[in-house]
């Protein structure tokens, strides 16, 4: 009888475990960390690392997440992930995941903010005009004269570079603040 109860319990846990992991707010209440917005100093440091990738003429490689010293190639989400990883070295903060797509970061690892509240190192989410899907991401620099300035990595410009869009560009899907473990 006890064996049957144990098997039923294991089966029940397997059904709820996937949902448990997807709900980060719920999960953090049971784990030994809290999920918070990345502090301003972390976001600013992340942006400085993006500038280093740009200065090193890092090329675009789809799926790339190369460390700065190696700098073979990096894609847009890899740039964001690596810059935030570097920015959190010797701090009490950690990324929610070490491998995320632009859409994953939009859905699960950031909090929506307005462009007027965006600070250096926050995130800009980009996609195809007419679609809600997020297919590209960059690190926000500033909003000035109706333009948004950011650093990203794209195949079209072959690597990490400074970009700018008009603030009303339909490709912009939103702005976000990275969420981190604390």
Model regions and ranges:
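Sec-dependent N-terminal signal peptides
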Residues: 4-13
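N-terminal capping segments
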Residues: 19-94
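...with weaker cross-activation on analogous glycine-rich loops/strands in unrelated enzymes
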Residues: 24-25, 35-47, 89-162
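Residues that form or immediately flank small-molecule/cofactor binding pockets and catalytic motifs
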Residues: 65, 155, 180
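Generic detection of short hydrophobic beta-strand segments and adjacent strand-loop junctions
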Residues: 163-167
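Low-complexity, Gly/Ser/Thr/Pro-rich intrinsically disordered linker/tail segments
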Residues: 170-182
